[in-house]
């Protein structure tokens, strides 16, 4: 099949959507398909390796300045149209999503969409708390309108599918968890020398244990809650250092918060890191933590498990079938006290036992299974379109 993937975020950006698309591109290509990606060009980024990555001129998005807004022009339109895709698979509800729909219409391609992001959790960036409920209703209505115009909708989890059904989406839906390259995160691939080098880079002192968070530093990721409980965690485990890998609009606020709480000496912000070496940052950790409730799947949880870390996460339906409390990770309730107790457990003997077996529970989320399921989804959609 000839497949076009369209997205408003892609490599070298580090987030779940970009990782999912990169994994899908690589695995489908390995399986003999011709796969092209169309996405915004990141500032300062030049790609000389891959002629199936089509980077489009872009500018920083007005609201989310760490994201890019693409401007697909006539040349890009010609390039995409002449490829005559069997499948157009959009991964965005905005600029590149519309561009993908336009290309699909031009070539009469089958149109698939993956709903990666629960947009009602992101309205704060526009409203800043003013009339936010009205904005959330608009986000729900827009998602319904958008998804009902596709041949098939792919949902990373049952949580997402249930949410879209509640919105009123009646297009055929399939639940297909995004896959990841499990092998590259395997603990045995990272030796002590590499681990020590990364820990030194992040200011980790000898004898300190690393509490790790990787991803976009944004309000919806709820890193504030982790920072709030950090002073009390340090009373129990004074050897902990909180390392935050990534970049985003909340970094300055969290830096100030760490100072005000008196924990700045135990917190490191690394800034953004390339996807090719992100596994090395997982490898230097001891416990991975997330308090986000806005995930559709949460690939970082699986990456952390594949890296042999104990994951401590605020419970969310996106984790159904991924983390079982006390077995493959530690799940907590939403309140601060519950998160604190979960982190104390994670740094105890229980956490060490969970970490020792974590990689086994990440194994089913590999890229091959993901690509096979997507391949079957495409074939089914093509067959139905011919009826």
Indicate where each model-derived feature is located:
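N-terminal subdomain of nucleotide-sugar transferases
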Residues: 1-45, 49-55, 375
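A conserved mid-protein helix/loop that constitutes part of the nucleotide-sugar donor-binding site
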Residues: 19, 209-235, 249-255
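Short alpha-helical donor nucleotide-sugar binding micro-motif in glycosyltransferases
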Residues: 147, 272-273, 280-285
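Aromatic "clamp/platform" in nucleotide-sugar-dependent glycosyltransferases that forms part
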Residues: 293
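Short hydrophobic beta-strand element within catalytic cores of glycosyltransferases
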Residues: 310-313
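Conserved acidic donor-binding segment of nucleotide-sugar-dependent glycosyltransferases
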Residues: 324-336, 345-350
């Amino acid at each position: 099949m000839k497949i076009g993937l369209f997205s408003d975020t892609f490599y070298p950006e580090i987030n779940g959507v970009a990782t999912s698309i990169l994994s899908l591109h690589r695995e489908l290509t390995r399986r003999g398909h011709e796969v092209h990606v169309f996405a915004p060009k990141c500032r300062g980024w030049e790609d000389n390796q891959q002629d199936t990555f089509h980077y489009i001129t872009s500018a920083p998005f007005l609201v989310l300045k760490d994201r890019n807004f693409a401007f697909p022009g006539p040349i890009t339109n010609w390039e995409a149209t002449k490829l005559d895709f069997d499948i157009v698979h959009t991964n965005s509800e905005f600029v590149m999503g519309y561009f993908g729909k336009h290309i699909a219409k031009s070539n009469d391609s089958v149109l698939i969409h993956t709903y990666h992001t629960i947009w009602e959790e992101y309205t704060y960036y526009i409203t800043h708390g003013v009339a936010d409920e009205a904005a959330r209703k608009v986000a729900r209505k827009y998602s319904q309108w958008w998804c009902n115009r596709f041949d098939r909708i792919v949902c990373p989890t049952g949580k997402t599918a249930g949410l879209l059904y509640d919105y009123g989406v009646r297009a055929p839906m399939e639940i297909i968890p995004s896959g990841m390259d499990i092998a590259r995160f395997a603990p045995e691939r990272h030796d002590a020398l590499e681990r020590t080098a990364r820990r030194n880079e992040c200011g980790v002192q000898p004898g300190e244990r690393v509490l790790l968070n990787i991803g976009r530093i944004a309000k919806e990721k709820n890193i504030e809650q982790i920072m709030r409980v950090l002073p009390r965690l340090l009373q129990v485990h004074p050897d902990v250092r909180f390392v935050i890998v990534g970049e985003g609009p909340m970094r300055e606020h969290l830096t100030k918060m760490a100072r005000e709480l008196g924990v700045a000496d135990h917190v490191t912000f690394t800034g953004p890191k390339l996807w090719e070496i992100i596994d090395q940052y997982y490898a230097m950790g001891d416990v991975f933590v997330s308090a986000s409730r806005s995930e559709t799947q949460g690939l970082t949880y699986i990456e952390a498990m594949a890296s042999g870390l104990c994951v401590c996460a605020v419970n969310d339906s996106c984790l159904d079938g991924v983390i079982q409390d006390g077995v493959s990770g530690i799940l907590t309730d939403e309140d601060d006290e519950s998160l604190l107790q979960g982190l104390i457990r994670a740094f105890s003997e229980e956490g060490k036992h969970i970490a020792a077996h974590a990689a086994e529970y990440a194994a089913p989320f590999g890229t091959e299974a993901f690509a096979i399921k997507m391949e079957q989804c495409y074939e089914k959609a093509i067959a139905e379109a011919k009826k």
